[in-house]
From Swiss-Prot:
Pfam families: Oxidored_q5_N, Proton_antipo_M. This is NADH-ubiquinone oxidoreductase chain 4. The gene is mt:ND4. The chain crosses the membrane at residues 4-24, 56-76, 93-113, 114-134, 139-159, 182-202, 218-238, 245-265, 272-292, 297-317, 330-350, 373-393, 426-446. It comes from Drosophila melanogaster. It catalyses: a ubiquinone + NADH + 5 H(+)(in) = a ubiquinol + NAD(+) + 4 H(+)(out). Keywords: Electron transport, Membrane, Mitochondrion, NAD, Respiratory chain, Translocase, Transmembrane, Transmembrane helix, Transport, Ubiquinone.
């Protein structure tokens, strides 16, 4: 683990040399390929120092972080072109990536908490510094307060655990079982807001709409996964409480997923639609995770990875048309089949991935999750069928309204994409569809 972290630390001086933008990006791809070679399918924590280690769960998420951060630089070419504080932008992304890797490879619960909360700060800087509208101040405030309000109880819960056990190590804490309601709520609420669960999801659409494309990618790709990862880690010593209370979260998530899907069908803003669809997807991830079945845990992990790639790619596509047309509105982004014919293919591929068509990872994850939730309670079939149906409905709405129809009268030409954009789409889509061939690493990590 340490070699990856030092590699990133030594990339920081490169940010301040002129014309080094693409060099940094190539180096980040290089790091992700090195990390790919480090994979030895350990079922237990491997490469343990005192506080850094890696098992299959954190391995996949670290790889996703490296990949998405490399693609963020590929997507944010406008910052490089207009020289919009690009040195600080690179620095921000590298620090964010460093914090994310440390979060996912932390062995100690307290270290995890520390990095989990500090990864919020670079994200906030991304939204406030490179966002598009003045409302980004409000979005940043929402993001900050929703997340920080619930993280204090979590800290108190961690201190209580330290007092009782005398160790913060995840590996040792699995031997304990706590039958304490308040501790359960303290530890879980922080992750529920980060997921986000329906009812505490209001910060997400705001943050997504105001963020630049890189901010949206990192939010959709990794920030939403932090909650799921933390929950997978702490659920093992909160099993008794979870059996007692899980029905609350599962029902809120499933009903909320259906409601959010209905909200999606009324959106006019491309980015807001994709953001709300993320809430619906994370709702089903949360429900599957809290059933605490083998299928549920593996499926939530699979869908987290798949959703990270898929919705990140959709945000990139929305940004491509935003750069050309200067608007995110569905009233202006219509008839794009005439405007950018070759981008329509990517719109189609990523939209179909979003509604879990084969052979994407989304399909695999959703099959696992549907199985686990139905095995938990067969009544949830009703909500799940609605969820699946509306998921396809709003994805088709997004695709058909943006690609078909009459071209907006203010647009007088057509535009072809750049090779950079096609590469960006390919690098989102290829892992998403090829990883299904390696699905044992999504099932056998537990």
């Amino acid at each position: 683990m340490l070699k990856i972290i030092f590699f990133l630390l030594f990339l920081i001086p490169f940010c301040f040399i002129n014309n080094m933008y693409w060099m940094v990006q190539i180096m980040m791809f290089f790091i992700s390929f090195i990390f790919l070679l480090m994979n030895n399918f350990m079922n237990y924590w491997s490469e343990i120092s005192y506080f850094l280690g890696c098992d299959m769960l954190s391995y996949g998420l670290i790889l996703l972080s490296l990949w998405i951060c490399s693609l963020m630089l590929l997507a944010s070419e406008m910052i490089n072109k207009h020289n919009n504080y690009k040195n600080l932008f690179l620095l921000n992304i590298i620090i964010l990536l460093l914090l994310l890797i440390l979060t996912f490879s932390s062995m100690s619960l307290f270290m995890f908490y520390l990095f989990f909360e500090s990864s919020l700060i670079p994200t906030l800087f991304l939204i406030l510094g490179w966002g598009y509208q003045p409302e980004r101040l409000q979005a940043g405030l929402y993001l900050l307060f929703y997340t920080l309000l619930v993280s204090l109880p979590m800290l108190i819960g961690i201190f209580y655990l330290m007092n009782k056990i005398g160790s913060m190590n995840f590996y040792l804490m699995n031997n304990f079982m706590f039958n304490y309601d308040l501790l359960y709520f303290c530890l879980l609420c922080a992750f529920l807001v980060k997921m986000p669960m329906f009812l505490v999801h209001l910060w997400l659409p705001k943050a997504h709409v105001e963020a630049p494309v890189s901010g949206s990618m990192i939010l959709a790709g990794i920030m939403l996964k932090l909650g799921g990862y933390g929950m997978l880690r702490v659920i093992s010593f909160l099993q008794l409480m979870n059996l007692k209370y899980s029905f609350v979260w599962i029902s809120i998530s499933l009903v909320g997923g259906v409601l959010v899907s209905l909200v999606c069908l009324r959106q006019t803003d491309l980015k807001a639609l994709i953001a709300y669809s993320s809430v619906a997807h994370m709702g089903i991830v949360l429900s599957g995770l809290l059933t605490m079945t083998y299928w549920g845990l593996c499926g939530s992990y699979t869908l987290m990875i798949a959703h990270g790639l898929c919705s990140s790619g959709l945000f990139c596509l929305a940004n491509v048309s935003y750069e050309r047309l200067g608007s995110r509105s569905m009233l202006i982004n219509k008839g794009l089949l005439n405007f950018m014919p070759s981008m329509t293919l990517w719109w189609f591929l990523l939209s179909s991935a979003n509604m879990a068509a084969p052979p994407t990872l989304n399909l695999l994850g959703e099959i696992y999750l549907l199985n686990s939730i139905v095995s938990w309670s067969w009544i949830s079939m009703i909500l799940l069928s609605f969820l699946s149906f509306f998921s396809a409905a709003y994805t088709l709405y997004l695709y058909s309204f943006s690609q078909h129809g009459k071209l907006f009268s203010g647009v007088y030409s057509f535009s072809s994409g750049k090779i950079r954009e096609y590469l960006l789409m390919l690098l989102h889509w290829l892992p998403l569809n090829l990883l299904i061939l390696k699905s044992e690493s999504f099932m056998l990590w537990l």
